[in-house]
Swiss-Prot record:
Lineage: superkingdom: Bacteria
GO molecular function, one term: structural constituent of ribosome
Phosphoprotein found in the keyword field: no
Gene: rplO
InterPro entries, A to Z: Ribosomal_uL15, Ribosomal_uL15/eL18, Ribosomal_uL15/eL18_sf, Ribosomal_uL15_bac-type, Ribosomal_uL15_CS
Native organism: Chromobacterium violaceum (strain ATCC 12472 / DSM 30191 / JCM 1249 / CCUG 213 / NBRC 12614 / NCIMB 9131 / NCTC 9757 / MK)
The protein, known as: Large ribosomal subunit protein uL15
UniProt key word Ribosomal protein: yes
One protein family per Pfam: Ribosomal_L27A
Keywords: Ribonucleoprotein, Ribosomal protein, RNA-binding, rRNA-binding
Subunit-level organization: Part of the 50S ribosomal subunit.
Amino acid sequence: MLLNTVQPGVGAKHAKRRVGRGIGSGLGKTCGRGHKGQKSRAGGFHKVGFEGGQMPLQRRLPKRGFKSLTARFVCEVRLSELNLLPVDEIDLLALKQAGLVAAQAQVAKVVLSGKVERAVKLRGISVTAGARAAIEAAGGSIE
């Protein structure tokens, strides 16, 4: 089979309807648009969501929440993910290179989730109280 010989199946494509070509075609005179009204006119259509002057749904519903502009710059790292890093001294750059935080991250925070199995030294990274206790119990330190 060649790409230039591929054709749609029989009956899969319908011929385009020619409108306004006489009463016998079934689509003459008004061309399937009915009589009068906004939808019968040329260029006469309303915007998406328009409800005929009634207050539209997106304006009837209350506003809710917001999108934080700082969320994309702050990342969390699990305690167990620190075991994946080959280095013992961990800073933001090391986390970025390992792919544990986003490239545009400016702040990282270590949270208590899992266990740290070796002594690690954190530099310039904030930690939760539980994570701090776990790191220091494993012989690590936080600067």
